C-alpha cells in the first residue's frame, strides 16, 4: 500500500468538502503558470482576423508563452490572479468535487451501485452549483491572468480593487459575466472529469489491475484529465474570451463563439489545447492524489481522536 491506509469508516461529507477545497488549492499552486499560459494563448488574436493571427502571434506554444512572459513581465506574471484563483478553488472545488458523492447518493437513493446516468447527473448538478457560488472569483482570476504588465497600464492593481472596479463599472452582473458558458463548461468538465475518474478507478479495481492506492489514483486522474481537455476545450476558450472581453464587445457567449468562428476559424476553439492538457492533466493528478490522501489522513485523525484509551 502506497500512501495513507484506507480507513474502515468512509469519509464524512465535511471531510470530503474541506479535503476537496484544500487539495484543489494545492494543485492550483503547483500548476498555475500553465493555466496563465493557457489564458494568454486563448485570448491571443481576439481582435485580429484569421490571416493576421499567425503572423503577429506574440505567444507560441506553452514553453514559448511562459518564457515570453518571464522575459517581458517578470516571473511573478505567471502567478497573476493567484489569490482569486485560490479563492475560486476553495469555494468551487469544495462544491463540485466535495459534494459529488453526496449528490450521487441522493440520486441513487443511498445505493452504492451508481449507474452512468446517476454519475453524469451528479456531476452536472455540482458543476453548475459551483459556478453559481464561485463565478466572481473566476472572472477576477481570468482578468488578472489576461492583463500584461508590459506596454501599458494594468487594469487592476489588486484582487480587492478588481472586485470593486468590476462591480462599479459593469454592475453586479459584471461579476457573474460568462456564467452561461461557464455553467456549460463546468457541467461538461465535472461530468467528464469526475465520472471518467470514477469509471477508470472502478475498472482498475474490479479487474484487480491495481489496488486502491497512489498508482491507481495517478492513472485514473491522468486519464480523466486528457478526456476532459478534449471535450471541454471549445467551451473553455469561449468562456475565457467572453469573461475577459470589454463591455459591449460581445452580445452573448453565442455571439462570442460565432465571432471566433468567422474571424479565426474552427481551430480557434482549440487554442491553448496543449497548456490546457498539461495543466488539467497535472492538476487532476495533484488534486485527486492529494484529495484521496487527505480524506484518509483526516479520517485516520478523527478515528484516533475518537478511539478509547
From Swiss-Prot:
Entry annotated with the keyword Coiled coil: no
GO cellular component: mitochondrial inner membrane; mitochondrial membrane
Record keywords, A-Z: Membrane, Mitochondrion, Mitochondrion inner membrane, Repeat, Transmembrane, Transmembrane helix, Transport
Name of this protein: Dicarboxylate carrier UCP2
Chain residue ranges for the region called Important for interaction with long-chain fatty acids: 16-63, 278-285
Entry-linked Pfam families: Mito_carr
Predominant place of localization: mitochondrion
Record's subcellular location: Mitochondrion inner membrane
Tissue: Expressed in a variety of organs, with predominant expression in the heart, lung and spleen.
Chain coiled-coil ranges: none
Solcar repeat intervals: 11-106, 114-203, 212-297
Organism: Rattus norvegicus (Rat)
UniProt cross-references to InterPro entries, sorted A to Z: Mit_carrier, Mito_Metabolite_Transporter, Mitochondrial_sb/sol_carrier, Mt_carrier_dom_sf
Protein family (similarity comment): Belongs to the mitochondrial carrier (TC 2.A.29) family.
Transmembrane segments: 17-40, 78-103, 120-145, 174-199, 218-242, 269-294
Amino acid at each position: 500500500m502506497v500512501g495513507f491506509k484506507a480507513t474502515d469508516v468512509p469519509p464524512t461529507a465535511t471531510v470530503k468538502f474541506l479535503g476537496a477545497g484544500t487539495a484543489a488549492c494545492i494543485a492550483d499552486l503547483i500548476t498555475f503558470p500553465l493555466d496563465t499560459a493557457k489564458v494568454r494563448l486563448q485570448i491571443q488574436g481576439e481582435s485580429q482576423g484569421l490571416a493576421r493571427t499567425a503572423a503577429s502571434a506574440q505567444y507560441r506554444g506553452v514553453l514559448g508563452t511562459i518564457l515570453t512572459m518571464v522575459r517581458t513581465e517578470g516571473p511573478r506574471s505567471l502567478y497573476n490572479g493567484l489569490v482569486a484563483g485560490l479563492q475560486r478553488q476553495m469555494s468551487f472545488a469544495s462544491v463540485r468535487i466535495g459534494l459529488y458523492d453526496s449528490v450521487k447518493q441522493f440520486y441513487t437513493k443511498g445505493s452504492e451501485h451508481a449507474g452512468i446516468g446517476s454519475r453524469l447527473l451528479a456531476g452536472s448538478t455540482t458543476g453548475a452549483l459551483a459556478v453559481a457560488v464561485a463565478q466572481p472569483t473566476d472572472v477576477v482570476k481570468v482578468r488578472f491572468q489576461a492583463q500584461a504588465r508590459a506596454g501599458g497600464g494594468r487594469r487592476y492593481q489588486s484582487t480587492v480593487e478588481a472586485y470593486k472596479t468590476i462591480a462599479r463599472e459593469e454592475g453586479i452582473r459584471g461579476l457573474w459575466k460568462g456564467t452561461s458558458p461557464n455553467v456549460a463548461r463546468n457541467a461538461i468538465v465535472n461530468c467528464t472529469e469526475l465520472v471518467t475518474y470514477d469509471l477508470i478507478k472502478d475498472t482498475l479495481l474490479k479487474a484487480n489491475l491495481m489496488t486502491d492506492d497512489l498508482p491507481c489514483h495517478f492513472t485514473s486522474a491522468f486519464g480523466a484529465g486528457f478526456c476532459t481537455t478534449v471535450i471541454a476545450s471549445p467551451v473553455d476558450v469561449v468562456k475565457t474570451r467572453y469573461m475577459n472581453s470589454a463591455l459591449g464587445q460581445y452580445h452573448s457567449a453565442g455571439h462570442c463563439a460565432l465571432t471566433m468562428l468567422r474571424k479565426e476559424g474552427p481551430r480557434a476553439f482549440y487554442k491553448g489545447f496543449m497548456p490546457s492538457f498539461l495543466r488539467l492533466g497535472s492538476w487532476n493528478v495533484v488534486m485527486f492524489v492529494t484529495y484521496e490522501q487527505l480524506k484518509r489522513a483526516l479520517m485516520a485523525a478523527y478515528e484516533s481522536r475518537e478511539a478509547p484509551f
